[in-house]
């Protein structure tokens, strides 16, 4: 029988674990090579032999008393709950600004640039994000789904609905992600490499000096189709209204005073850089909105009537007696705390200074 290089002391209690038998050769210091004596007498830890279970008490090598228990490995952490995605991830999908050099509408659901791309220019946008809650997103998605279904079903009876396709603004068409919606504070802008940094500094300074603190908006302004003269698309929008500190929406002759102030500051800065203003008219306070769907077709009377009938449907997921219109007007709102400036793919966040109660701001 071959003699093992190392034989454990009989008092160590480890013979069975090491596979030695009772009739095998006894351990003797004279039988151990010098290089192994040094290892045996040294402090080399308490590693268990490879065949030992993880929780088996193992005696330290070269010692006849005391045990050391190797604790079992901790159970792997559950991966069922994922960490929340940072809202900065949404900055990649918050704006419709595109930065590709070539314009191929077939790759973007037929959408075309309002401003043709010129190498060296930076498409830009100033806006306020709204990332709907799961309940609001489900409600709006159900509205768009119903509208798509009813338009397709009614196309045979109403010629002005033939070929009309409704596209949602709630999800990115190219990636399986929910998109945050937005309130625009500028028209589509085109900045140059030379002036983009100066524009960012100036528009940030203008927003900071506006005196506007965080405020709350809801969608009591109603729902309707909107198409601008320069656009090739029609948009289904939720009209935004600011909520006063009392919880009531503004109902005076100057709706949305805070949004109007922010827009005026952005428009002034845009004009200084030769860029077009947004809503540069007397009724700008009524025109703030969030887009939830769009179509290439012009909004016909049939499309408007179908949209109204869906919004007035009294069978929502919330109540048999509450229409979608009522739910949006009374239950959906969000707090505006940040304005974002997107230049190319870079998004800068400007936090509105919180000065306590956000009182109405006088417009100029």
Swiss-Prot record:
Listed EC numbers: 4.6.1.-
Biased composition (Low complexity): 9-29
BP terms from Gene Ontology: U6 snRNA 3'-end processing
Enzyme class (EC, first level): lyase
UniProt keyword terms in alphabetical order: Hydrolase, Lyase, Nuclease, Nucleus
Gene3D superfamilies to which the protein is assigned, alphabetical: Cyclic phosphodiesterase (3.90.1140.10)
Sequence positions that bind UMP: 279, 287-291
Binding site for AMP: 182-184, 279, 281-291
Keyword Phosphoprotein on entry: no
Family: Belongs to the 2H phosphoesterase superfamily. USB1 family.
HAMAP family cross-referenced by the UniProt entry: USB1
Record's function text: 3'-5' RNA exonuclease that trims the 3' end of oligo(U) tracts of the pre-U6 small nuclear RNA (snRNA) molecule, leading to the formation of a U6 snRNA 3' end-terminated with a 2',3'-cyclic phosphate. Participates in the U6 snRNA 3' end processing that prevents U6 snRNA degradation.
Protein name per Swiss-Prot or TrEMBL: U6 snRNA phosphodiesterase 1
């Amino acid at each position: 029988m071959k003699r093992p290089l190392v034989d454990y002391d009989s008092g160590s209690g480890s013979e069975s674990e090491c596979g030695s038998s009772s009739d095998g050769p006894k351990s003797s210091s004279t039988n151990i090579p010098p290089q192994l004596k040094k290892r045996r007498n040294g402090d080399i830890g308490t590693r268990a032999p490879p065949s030992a279970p993880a929780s088996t008490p193992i005696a330290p090598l070269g010692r006849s008393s005391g045990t050391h228990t190797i604790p079992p490995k901790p159970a792997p952490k559950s991966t069922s709950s994922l960490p929340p995605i940072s809202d900065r991830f949404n900055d990649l999908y918050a704006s419709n600004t595109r930065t590709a050099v070539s314009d191929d509408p077939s790759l973007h659901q037929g959408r075309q640039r309002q401003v043709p791309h010129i190498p060296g220019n930076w498409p830009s946008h100033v806006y306020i994000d709204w990332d709907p809650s799961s309940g609001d997103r489900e409600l709006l998605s159900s509205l768009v789904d119903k509208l798509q279904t009813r338009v397709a079903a009614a196309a045979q009876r109403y010629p002005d609905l033939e070929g009309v396709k409704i596209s949602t603004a709630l999800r990115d068409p190219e990636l399986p992600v929910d998109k945050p919606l937005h309130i625009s504070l500028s028209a589509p802008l085109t900045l140059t490499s030379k002036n983009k940094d100066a524009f960012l500094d100036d528009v940030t300074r203008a927003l900071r000096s506006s005196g506007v603190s965080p405020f709350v908006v809801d969608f009591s302004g109603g729902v309707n189709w909107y198409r601008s003269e320069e656009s090739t698309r029609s948009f289904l929008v939720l009209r935004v209204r600011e909520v006063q500190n009392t919880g009531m929406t503004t109902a005076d002759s100057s709706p949305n005073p805070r949004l109007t102030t922010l827009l005026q500051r952005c428009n002034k800065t845009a004009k200084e850089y030769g860029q077009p203003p947004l809503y540069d008219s007397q009724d700008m306070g009524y025109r703030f909105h969030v887009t939830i769907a769009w179509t290439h077709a012009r909004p016909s009377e049939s499309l408007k009537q179908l949209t109204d009938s869906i919004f007035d449907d009294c069978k929502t997921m919330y109540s048999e007696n509450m229409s979608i219109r009522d739910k949006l007007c009374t239950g959906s709102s969000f707090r505006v705390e940040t304005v974002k400036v997107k230049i190319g793919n870079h998004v800068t966040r400007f936090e509105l200074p919180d000065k306590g109660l956000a009182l109405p701001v006088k417009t100029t």
